[in-house]
Amino acid sequence: MNTFETVIGIEIHIELNTKTKMFSPAPNKFNEKPNTLVHPIDVAYPGTLPRLNKEAVVKAIKLAKALNMEIDTLLRFDRKNYFYPDLPKSFQITQQNFPIGKNGTLTIESNGKKKEILIERIHLEEDTAKQIHLNDKTLVDYNRAGVPLIEIVTKPIISNAEEAANYVDMIRKIVSFIDISDAKMSEGSLRADVNISIRPFGQKFLGEKVEIKNLNSVSNLKKAIEFEKNLQIKKILSNEKIESQTKRFDESKNETVVMRTKSKTIDYKYIPEPNIPFIRIPKDFIDKIKVENLPWNIEKKLLSQNISSEFVQQFLNDFQMLLVFESIIYPNREKLSKVFFSELISLANSKNVHIKDLKFNFSEFVIALKFLDNGEISGKHLKTIINEIFTKNEKVEDIVSRNNLRLISDEDLIFNLINKASKDKNEIILEYPNKPEKVLKYLTGFVMKETEGQANPVLSFNLAKKYLDEKFKKV
Protein backbone atom coordinates (compact mmCIF):
# COMPACT_ATOMS: atom_id res chain seq x y z
CA MET A 1 0.00 0.00 0.00
CA ASN A 2 3.03 2.30 0.38
CA THR A 3 3.35 2.42 -3.40
CA PHE A 4 0.25 4.61 -3.61
CA GLU A 5 -0.26 8.27 -2.86
CA THR A 6 -3.46 9.75 -1.42
CA VAL A 7 -4.56 13.10 -2.84
CA ILE A 8 -7.17 15.05 -0.90
CA GLY A 9 -8.98 18.33 -1.44
CA ILE A 10 -11.42 19.74 1.09
CA GLU A 11 -14.41 22.06 0.77
CA ILE A 12 -15.65 23.58 4.02
CA HIS A 13 -18.97 25.38 4.37
CA ILE A 14 -19.18 27.82 7.28
CA GLU A 15 -22.43 29.36 8.47
CA LEU A 16 -21.74 32.96 9.43
CA ASN A 17 -22.98 34.34 12.75
CA THR A 18 -24.54 37.46 11.24
CA LYS A 19 -27.67 38.98 12.76
CA THR A 20 -29.66 38.52 9.55
CA LYS A 21 -29.60 36.31 6.46
CA MET A 22 -27.46 36.75 3.37
CA PHE A 23 -29.98 38.55 1.17
CA SER A 24 -32.98 39.22 3.44
CA PRO A 25 -33.72 40.87 6.81
CA ALA A 26 -34.90 37.58 8.35
CA PRO A 27 -33.11 36.73 11.64
CA ASN A 28 -30.21 34.31 11.42
CA LYS A 29 -30.71 31.99 14.41
CA PHE A 30 -30.28 28.29 15.11
CA ASN A 31 -32.72 25.79 16.59
CA GLU A 32 -35.85 27.93 16.33
CA LYS A 33 -39.32 26.57 15.59
CA PRO A 34 -39.44 25.41 11.92
CA ASN A 35 -40.46 27.98 9.32
CA THR A 36 -40.63 30.91 11.76
CA LEU A 37 -37.57 32.80 10.45
CA VAL A 38 -38.65 33.16 6.85
CA HIS A 39 -38.85 36.32 4.75
CA PRO A 40 -40.53 36.50 1.32
CA ILE A 41 -37.06 36.91 -0.24
CA ASP A 42 -35.99 33.54 1.25
CA VAL A 43 -38.80 31.65 -0.47
CA ALA A 44 -38.68 33.54 -3.77
CA TYR A 45 -42.00 35.35 -3.67
CA PRO A 46 -42.60 37.16 -6.98
CA GLY A 47 -41.28 40.69 -7.00
CA THR A 48 -38.78 40.24 -4.17
CA LEU A 49 -35.18 41.33 -4.68
CA PRO A 50 -32.06 40.30 -2.75
CA ARG A 51 -30.28 42.84 -0.52
CA LEU A 52 -26.65 42.01 0.22
CA ASN A 53 -25.70 41.68 3.90
CA LYS A 54 -22.79 44.05 4.62
CA GLU A 55 -21.89 42.17 7.82
CA ALA A 56 -21.36 38.97 5.82
CA VAL A 57 -18.98 40.79 3.47
CA VAL A 58 -16.96 42.12 6.44
CA LYS A 59 -16.66 38.61 7.89
CA ALA A 60 -15.53 37.23 4.52
CA ILE A 61 -12.83 39.90 4.32
CA LYS A 62 -11.67 39.00 7.86
CA LEU A 63 -11.32 35.35 6.86
CA ALA A 64 -9.51 36.27 3.64
CA LYS A 65 -7.00 38.29 5.67
CA ALA A 66 -6.54 35.47 8.18
CA LEU A 67 -5.75 33.08 5.31
CA ASN A 68 -3.35 35.50 3.54
CA MET A 69 -5.59 35.78 0.48
CA GLU A 70 -5.88 38.18 -2.41
CA ILE A 71 -9.14 40.09 -1.91
CA ASP A 72 -11.29 40.95 -4.93
CA THR A 73 -12.37 44.56 -4.47
CA LEU A 74 -15.25 44.15 -6.94
CA LEU A 75 -18.08 42.06 -5.48
CA ARG A 76 -19.89 39.98 -8.10
CA PHE A 77 -22.42 37.18 -7.72
CA ASP A 78 -23.67 34.35 -9.92
CA ARG A 79 -26.71 32.10 -10.11
CA LYS A 80 -26.20 28.36 -9.74
CA ASN A 81 -29.25 26.86 -11.42
CA TYR A 82 -30.69 23.52 -10.33
CA PHE A 83 -33.98 22.12 -9.04
CA TYR A 84 -34.28 20.61 -5.58
CA PRO A 85 -36.99 20.78 -2.89
CA ASP A 86 -34.73 22.71 -0.49
CA LEU A 87 -34.06 25.46 -3.06
CA PRO A 88 -37.25 27.55 -3.48
CA LYS A 89 -35.80 29.88 -6.13
CA SER A 90 -34.48 26.93 -8.18
CA PHE A 91 -31.14 28.71 -8.10
CA GLN A 92 -28.55 29.55 -5.47
CA ILE A 93 -26.80 32.91 -5.33
CA THR A 94 -23.05 32.27 -5.09
CA GLN A 95 -19.68 33.54 -6.39
CA GLN A 96 -18.64 30.90 -8.89
CA ASN A 97 -16.63 33.10 -11.23
CA PHE A 98 -15.36 35.88 -8.98
CA PRO A 99 -14.69 34.69 -5.41
CA ILE A 100 -14.05 37.35 -2.80
CA GLY A 101 -10.75 35.71 -1.83
CA LYS A 102 -8.24 33.57 -3.73
CA ASN A 103 -4.74 32.10 -3.47
CA GLY A 104 -4.47 31.74 0.29
CA THR A 105 -2.22 29.69 2.56
CA LEU A 106 -2.52 28.10 5.98
CA THR A 107 0.35 26.38 7.79
CA ILE A 108 -0.59 23.31 9.81
CA GLU A 109 1.42 20.83 11.84
CA SER A 110 1.08 17.08 11.28
CA ASN A 111 3.20 14.36 12.87
CA GLY A 112 5.68 16.96 14.10
CA LYS A 113 6.18 18.56 10.67
CA LYS A 114 4.82 21.83 9.31
CA LYS A 115 2.99 21.88 5.99
CA GLU A 116 1.58 24.75 3.98
CA ILE A 117 -1.96 24.12 2.73
CA LEU A 118 -2.79 26.03 -0.45
CA ILE A 119 -6.30 27.47 -0.43
CA GLU A 120 -7.71 28.06 -3.87
CA ARG A 121 -10.63 30.32 -2.97
CA ILE A 122 -13.25 31.44 -0.50
CA HIS A 123 -16.62 32.69 -1.69
CA LEU A 124 -19.89 33.94 -0.27
CA GLU A 125 -23.18 32.18 -0.94
CA GLU A 126 -26.54 31.42 0.64
CA ASP A 127 -27.52 28.17 2.35
CA THR A 128 -30.39 25.96 1.25
CA ALA A 129 -33.40 24.98 3.35
CA LYS A 130 -33.21 21.93 5.61
CA GLN A 131 -34.88 18.68 4.61
CA ILE A 132 -36.27 16.43 7.35
CA HIS A 133 -37.16 12.88 6.35
CA LEU A 134 -40.07 11.50 8.36
CA ASN A 135 -41.30 8.00 7.52
CA ASP A 136 -42.37 8.20 3.87
CA LYS A 137 -42.51 12.00 3.81
CA THR A 138 -39.95 14.77 3.41
CA LEU A 139 -40.52 17.99 5.35
CA VAL A 140 -38.76 21.26 4.56
CA ASP A 141 -37.70 23.88 7.12
CA TYR A 142 -36.99 27.20 5.40
CA ASN A 143 -35.39 28.79 8.46
CA ARG A 144 -31.99 27.84 7.02
CA ALA A 145 -32.78 29.10 3.50
CA GLY A 146 -30.66 32.16 2.85
CA VAL A 147 -28.34 31.79 5.84
CA PRO A 148 -24.95 33.34 4.91
CA LEU A 149 -22.23 30.85 4.03
CA ILE A 150 -18.56 31.01 3.20
CA GLU A 151 -17.13 28.10 1.26
CA ILE A 152 -13.39 27.45 1.63
CA VAL A 153 -11.81 25.33 -1.11
CA THR A 154 -8.29 23.90 -0.91
CA LYS A 155 -6.14 22.75 -3.77
CA PRO A 156 -5.66 18.93 -3.91
CA ILE A 157 -2.54 19.07 -1.76
CA ILE A 158 -3.48 17.20 1.42
CA SER A 159 -1.80 13.80 1.69
CA ASN A 160 -3.44 11.90 4.53
CA ALA A 161 -6.21 11.80 7.11
CA GLU A 162 -4.07 13.38 9.83
CA GLU A 163 -3.28 16.43 7.70
CA ALA A 164 -6.93 16.73 6.68
CA ALA A 165 -8.11 16.58 10.29
CA ASN A 166 -5.54 19.14 11.45
CA TYR A 167 -6.48 21.49 8.60
CA VAL A 168 -10.21 21.33 9.37
CA ASP A 169 -9.53 21.75 13.08
CA MET A 170 -7.36 24.82 12.43
CA ILE A 171 -10.06 26.36 10.20
CA ARG A 172 -12.57 25.69 12.99
CA LYS A 173 -10.35 27.51 15.47
CA ILE A 174 -9.71 30.46 13.15
CA VAL A 175 -13.37 31.16 12.33
CA SER A 176 -14.29 30.87 16.03
CA PHE A 177 -11.46 33.10 17.22
CA ILE A 178 -12.06 35.87 14.68
CA ASP A 179 -15.79 35.65 15.50
CA ILE A 180 -17.32 34.92 12.13
CA SER A 181 -18.96 31.60 13.11
CA ASP A 182 -19.47 29.41 16.15
CA ALA A 183 -18.11 26.56 13.95
CA LYS A 184 -20.13 23.87 15.73
CA MET A 185 -19.82 20.84 13.47
CA SER A 186 -22.45 18.97 15.49
CA GLU A 187 -25.00 21.68 14.65
CA GLY A 188 -23.99 22.00 11.00
CA SER A 189 -22.45 25.47 11.20
CA LEU A 190 -19.21 23.96 9.87
CA ARG A 191 -19.55 21.16 7.31
CA ALA A 192 -16.72 19.48 5.43
CA ASP A 193 -16.79 17.71 2.06
CA VAL A 194 -13.73 15.65 1.13
CA ASN A 195 -12.55 14.78 -2.39
CA ILE A 196 -10.17 11.83 -2.33
CA SER A 197 -8.30 9.96 -5.03
CA ILE A 198 -5.42 7.48 -5.18
CA ARG A 199 -2.51 7.33 -7.62
CA PRO A 200 0.82 5.48 -7.83
CA PHE A 201 3.76 7.48 -6.49
CA GLY A 202 5.32 9.51 -9.28
CA GLN A 203 2.16 9.66 -11.41
CA LYS A 204 1.37 13.27 -12.32
CA PHE A 205 -2.31 13.12 -13.22
CA LEU A 206 -4.96 12.54 -10.58
CA GLY A 207 -6.96 9.36 -10.21
CA GLU A 208 -10.77 9.19 -10.30
CA LYS A 209 -12.03 11.07 -7.26
CA VAL A 210 -14.75 10.21 -4.78
CA GLU A 211 -16.53 12.94 -2.83
CA ILE A 212 -17.60 12.30 0.78
CA LYS A 213 -20.28 14.81 1.80
CA ASN A 214 -21.24 16.55 5.04
CA LEU A 215 -18.71 15.17 7.50
CA ASN A 216 -19.87 16.44 10.89
CA SER A 217 -16.82 15.90 13.11
CA VAL A 218 -13.05 15.82 12.80
CA SER A 219 -12.92 12.23 14.04
CA ASN A 220 -15.47 11.09 11.44
CA LEU A 221 -13.50 12.92 8.75
CA LYS A 222 -10.38 10.93 9.67
CA LYS A 223 -12.27 7.64 9.72
CA ALA A 224 -13.96 8.35 6.38
CA ILE A 225 -10.67 9.20 4.65
CA GLU A 226 -8.90 6.12 6.04
CA PHE A 227 -11.72 3.82 4.98
CA GLU A 228 -12.05 5.32 1.50
CA LYS A 229 -8.28 5.32 0.93
CA ASN A 230 -8.00 1.63 1.79
CA LEU A 231 -11.07 0.80 -0.29
CA GLN A 232 -9.69 2.54 -3.39
CA ILE A 233 -6.26 0.90 -3.02
CA LYS A 234 -7.93 -2.48 -2.68
CA LYS A 235 -9.92 -1.85 -5.88
CA ILE A 236 -6.81 -0.79 -7.80
CA LEU A 237 -4.92 -3.91 -6.69
CA SER A 238 -7.91 -6.03 -7.77
CA ASN A 239 -8.05 -4.28 -11.18
CA GLU A 240 -11.48 -2.86 -10.34
CA LYS A 241 -12.57 0.46 -11.76
CA ILE A 242 -12.95 3.38 -9.36
CA GLU A 243 -16.08 5.30 -10.25
CA SER A 244 -16.64 8.98 -9.66
CA GLN A 245 -19.17 8.90 -6.83
CA THR A 246 -20.73 10.97 -4.10
CA LYS A 247 -20.73 9.22 -0.74
CA ARG A 248 -21.66 9.76 2.88
CA PHE A 249 -20.06 8.35 6.02
CA ASP A 250 -22.03 5.77 8.01
CA GLU A 251 -20.98 6.27 11.65
CA SER A 252 -22.58 3.02 12.82
CA LYS A 253 -20.48 0.95 10.40
CA ASN A 254 -17.45 3.27 10.10
CA GLU A 255 -17.59 3.07 6.32
CA THR A 256 -18.46 5.24 3.34
CA VAL A 257 -21.75 4.58 1.54
CA VAL A 258 -22.61 5.48 -2.07
CA MET A 259 -25.28 8.15 -2.47
CA ARG A 260 -25.04 8.52 -6.24
CA THR A 261 -22.69 7.90 -9.15
CA LYS A 262 -21.54 10.88 -11.19
CA SER A 263 -22.00 9.71 -14.76
CA LYS A 264 -21.20 13.14 -16.11
CA THR A 265 -20.35 16.62 -14.92
CA ILE A 266 -23.46 18.55 -13.91
CA ASP A 267 -24.01 21.76 -15.85
CA TYR A 268 -25.40 24.31 -13.42
CA LYS A 269 -25.69 26.91 -16.18
CA TYR A 270 -24.05 29.64 -14.14
CA ILE A 271 -25.09 33.15 -15.12
CA PRO A 272 -24.31 36.54 -13.55
CA GLU A 273 -26.84 37.43 -10.84
CA PRO A 274 -28.86 40.23 -12.49
CA ASN A 275 -30.48 41.56 -9.29
CA ILE A 276 -27.25 42.37 -7.44
CA PRO A 277 -25.16 45.06 -9.15
CA PHE A 278 -21.38 44.95 -9.02
CA ILE A 279 -20.18 46.55 -5.78
CA ARG A 280 -16.78 48.22 -5.49
CA ILE A 281 -15.20 47.75 -2.04
CA PRO A 282 -13.06 50.80 -1.14
CA LYS A 283 -9.48 50.06 -0.08
CA ASP A 284 -9.83 52.07 3.12
CA PHE A 285 -12.90 49.95 4.03
CA ILE A 286 -10.81 46.79 3.69
CA ASP A 287 -7.88 48.33 5.60
CA LYS A 288 -10.12 49.17 8.57
CA ILE A 289 -11.15 45.53 9.01
CA LYS A 290 -8.77 44.11 11.60
CA VAL A 291 -8.07 40.44 12.26
CA GLU A 292 -7.28 39.73 15.88
CA ASN A 293 -7.17 36.65 18.10
CA LEU A 294 -5.62 34.31 15.55
CA PRO A 295 -5.03 30.91 17.20
CA TRP A 296 -1.23 30.86 16.78
CA ASN A 297 -0.94 34.32 18.37
CA ILE A 298 -3.19 33.28 21.26
CA GLU A 299 -1.13 30.11 21.76
CA LYS A 300 2.11 32.10 21.86
CA LYS A 301 0.68 34.56 24.39
CA LEU A 302 -0.68 31.86 26.72
CA LEU A 303 2.57 29.88 26.66
CA SER A 304 4.52 33.06 27.46
CA GLN A 305 2.39 33.32 30.63
CA ASN A 306 3.74 29.90 31.71
CA ILE A 307 0.36 28.24 31.23
CA SER A 308 0.82 24.52 30.61
CA SER A 309 0.59 23.29 27.01
CA GLU A 310 -2.26 20.99 28.07
CA PHE A 311 -4.34 23.92 29.31
CA VAL A 312 -3.41 26.00 26.25
CA GLN A 313 -4.75 23.30 23.92
CA GLN A 314 -8.00 23.17 25.88
CA PHE A 315 -8.37 26.93 25.48
CA LEU A 316 -7.63 26.71 21.75
CA ASN A 317 -10.32 24.05 21.38
CA ASP A 318 -12.94 26.17 23.16
CA PHE A 319 -12.91 29.88 22.38
CA GLN A 320 -15.86 30.63 24.70
CA MET A 321 -13.93 29.08 27.59
CA LEU A 322 -10.92 31.22 26.69
CA LEU A 323 -13.08 34.36 26.71
CA VAL A 324 -14.22 33.59 30.26
CA PHE A 325 -10.62 33.01 31.35
CA GLU A 326 -9.45 36.25 29.70
CA SER A 327 -12.22 38.21 31.44
CA ILE A 328 -10.86 37.29 34.90
CA ILE A 329 -8.50 40.05 36.04
CA TYR A 330 -5.74 38.41 38.08
CA PRO A 331 -2.01 38.94 37.43
CA ASN A 332 -0.64 35.41 37.97
CA ARG A 333 -2.06 33.73 34.86
CA GLU A 334 -0.27 30.44 35.51
CA LYS A 335 -1.81 30.10 38.97
CA LEU A 336 -5.19 31.29 37.66
CA SER A 337 -5.18 28.64 34.92
CA LYS A 338 -4.59 25.85 37.44
CA VAL A 339 -7.44 26.97 39.70
CA PHE A 340 -9.63 27.72 36.66
CA PHE A 341 -9.47 24.12 35.47
CA SER A 342 -9.29 22.35 38.83
CA GLU A 343 -12.16 24.29 40.42
CA LEU A 344 -14.23 26.37 37.99
CA ILE A 345 -14.34 23.97 35.04
CA SER A 346 -14.97 21.10 37.46
CA LEU A 347 -17.83 23.09 39.01
CA ALA A 348 -19.35 23.85 35.59
CA ASN A 349 -19.04 20.21 34.53
CA SER A 350 -20.74 19.05 37.73
CA LYS A 351 -23.69 21.29 36.87
CA ASN A 352 -23.72 20.15 33.21
CA VAL A 353 -23.28 23.70 31.89
CA HIS A 354 -20.61 25.43 29.88
CA ILE A 355 -18.41 27.76 31.91
CA LYS A 356 -19.80 30.75 29.95
CA ASP A 357 -23.31 29.88 31.21
CA LEU A 358 -22.28 29.34 34.83
CA LYS A 359 -24.00 31.89 37.07
CA PHE A 360 -20.96 32.75 39.15
CA ASN A 361 -19.48 35.90 40.70
CA PHE A 362 -15.99 35.96 39.19
CA SER A 363 -15.11 39.20 41.03
CA GLU A 364 -15.51 37.42 44.38
CA PHE A 365 -13.49 34.52 42.98
CA VAL A 366 -10.57 36.91 42.39
CA ILE A 367 -10.93 38.20 45.97
CA ALA A 368 -10.71 34.58 47.17
CA LEU A 369 -7.46 34.15 45.23
CA LYS A 370 -6.06 37.28 46.87
CA PHE A 371 -6.99 35.87 50.30
CA LEU A 372 -5.00 32.77 49.33
CA ASP A 373 -2.04 34.87 48.17
CA ASN A 374 -2.02 36.82 51.44
CA GLY A 375 -2.01 33.64 53.50
CA GLU A 376 -5.46 34.37 54.96
CA ILE A 377 -6.92 31.05 53.75
CA SER A 378 -5.53 27.70 52.65
CA GLY A 379 -5.86 25.94 49.31
CA LYS A 380 -8.22 23.49 51.00
CA HIS A 381 -10.46 26.37 52.07
CA LEU A 382 -10.53 27.81 48.53
CA LYS A 383 -12.74 24.98 47.27
CA THR A 384 -15.24 25.59 50.09
CA ILE A 385 -15.30 29.31 49.34
CA ILE A 386 -15.81 28.79 45.58
CA ASN A 387 -18.75 26.45 46.24
CA GLU A 388 -20.37 28.97 48.58
CA ILE A 389 -19.82 31.83 46.13
CA PHE A 390 -21.75 29.70 43.64
CA THR A 391 -24.53 28.37 45.89
CA LYS A 392 -25.10 31.41 48.13
CA ASN A 393 -23.56 34.28 46.13
CA GLU A 394 -21.94 35.58 49.33
CA LYS A 395 -18.93 37.82 49.72
CA VAL A 396 -15.63 36.07 50.45
CA GLU A 397 -15.16 38.04 53.69
CA ASP A 398 -18.53 36.82 54.98
CA ILE A 399 -17.83 33.20 53.98
CA VAL A 400 -14.43 33.23 55.69
CA SER A 401 -15.80 34.77 58.89
CA ARG A 402 -18.89 32.58 59.13
CA ASN A 403 -16.93 29.35 58.59
CA ASN A 404 -13.92 30.44 60.71
CA LEU A 405 -11.58 29.85 57.75
CA ARG A 406 -9.09 32.63 58.37
CA LEU A 407 -5.60 31.24 58.99
CA ILE A 408 -3.48 32.20 61.99
CA SER A 409 -0.57 34.36 60.83
CA ASP A 410 0.61 35.56 64.23
CA GLU A 411 4.38 35.00 63.98
CA ASP A 412 4.94 35.23 67.75
CA LEU A 413 2.30 32.57 68.44
CA ILE A 414 3.68 30.23 65.78
CA PHE A 415 7.28 30.80 66.92
CA ASN A 416 6.36 29.97 70.53
CA LEU A 417 4.78 26.69 69.38
CA ILE A 418 7.93 25.83 67.38
CA ASN A 419 10.07 26.56 70.43
CA LYS A 420 7.83 24.35 72.59
CA ALA A 421 8.04 21.44 70.11
CA SER A 422 11.81 21.85 69.95
CA LYS A 423 12.16 21.50 73.73
CA ASP A 424 9.68 18.60 73.97
CA LYS A 425 11.38 16.55 71.26
CA ASN A 426 14.97 17.74 71.30
CA GLU A 427 16.22 14.34 70.04
CA ILE A 428 14.25 14.85 66.78
CA ILE A 429 15.50 18.41 66.43
CA LEU A 430 19.11 17.22 66.65
CA GLU A 431 18.58 15.22 63.44
CA TYR A 432 18.14 18.44 61.40
CA PRO A 433 21.65 18.58 59.83
CA ASN A 434 21.22 15.07 58.39
CA LYS A 435 17.44 14.87 57.96
CA PRO A 436 16.19 18.44 57.42
CA GLU A 437 12.94 17.42 55.66
CA LYS A 438 11.92 15.09 58.50
CA VAL A 439 12.49 17.74 61.18
CA LEU A 440 10.75 20.52 59.23
CA LYS A 441 7.78 18.23 58.63
CA TYR A 442 7.61 17.43 62.35
CA LEU A 443 7.70 21.09 63.47
CA THR A 444 5.17 22.25 60.87
CA GLY A 445 2.89 19.34 61.73
CA PHE A 446 3.13 20.15 65.45
CA VAL A 447 2.06 23.75 64.80
CA MET A 448 -0.87 22.65 62.63
CA LYS A 449 -1.99 20.13 65.25
CA GLU A 450 -1.82 22.63 68.13
CA THR A 451 -3.85 25.20 66.13
CA GLU A 452 -6.33 22.61 64.85
CA GLY A 453 -5.22 23.27 61.27
CA GLN A 454 -5.75 27.03 61.49
CA ALA A 455 -2.12 28.12 61.30
CA ASN A 456 -0.76 29.34 57.99
CA PRO A 457 1.20 26.26 56.80
CA VAL A 458 3.60 28.20 54.56
CA LEU A 459 4.38 30.70 57.29
CA SER A 460 4.78 27.88 59.83
CA PHE A 461 7.22 26.06 57.55
CA ASN A 462 9.27 29.20 56.87
CA LEU A 463 9.47 30.12 60.56
CA ALA A 464 10.47 26.55 61.45
CA LYS A 465 13.25 26.64 58.87
CA LYS A 466 14.43 30.04 60.08
CA TYR A 467 14.44 28.78 63.69
CA LEU A 468 16.42 25.62 62.83
CA ASP A 469 18.92 27.38 60.56
CA GLU A 470 19.73 29.90 63.29
CA LYS A 471 19.87 27.22 65.99
CA PHE A 472 22.37 25.02 64.14
CA LYS A 473 24.38 27.96 62.85
CA LYS A 474 25.34 28.69 66.44
CA VAL A 475 26.41 25.09 67.15
Curated annotation (Swiss-Prot):
Gene Ontology molecular functions: asparaginyl-tRNA synthase (glutamine-hydrolyzing) activity; ATP binding; glutaminyl-tRNA synthase (glutamine-hydrolyzing) activity
Reactions accelerated catalytically: L-glutamyl-tRNA(Gln) + L-glutamine + ATP + H2O = L-glutaminyl-tRNA(Gln) + L-glutamate + ADP + phosphate + H(+); L-aspartyl-tRNA(Asn) + L-glutamine + ATP + H2O = L-asparaginyl-tRNA(Asn) + L-glutamate + ADP + phosphate + 2 H(+)
InterPro entries for the chain: Asn/Gln-tRNA_amidoTrfase_suB/E, Asn/Gln-tRNA_Trfase_suB/E_cat, Asn/Gln_amidotransferase, Asn/Gln_tRNA_amidoTrase-B-like, GatB, GatB_Yqey_C_2, Gln-tRNA_amidoTrfase_suB_CS, Gln_synth/guanido_kin_cat_dom
EC annotation from Swiss-Prot or TrEMBL: 6.3.5.-
GO BP annotations, alphabetical order: glutaminyl-tRNAGln biosynthesis via transamidation; translation
Keyword terms: ATP-binding, Ligase, Nucleotide-binding, Protein biosynthesis
PANTHER family found in the cross-reference section: GLUTAMYL-TRNA GLN AMIDOTRANSFERASE SUBUNIT B MITOCHONDRIAL AND PROKARYOTIC PET112-RELATED, GLUTAMYL-TRNA(GLN) AMIDOTRANSFERASE SUBUNIT B, MITOCHONDRIAL
Name this polypeptide is given: Aspartyl/glutamyl-tRNA(Asn/Gln) amidotransferase subunit B
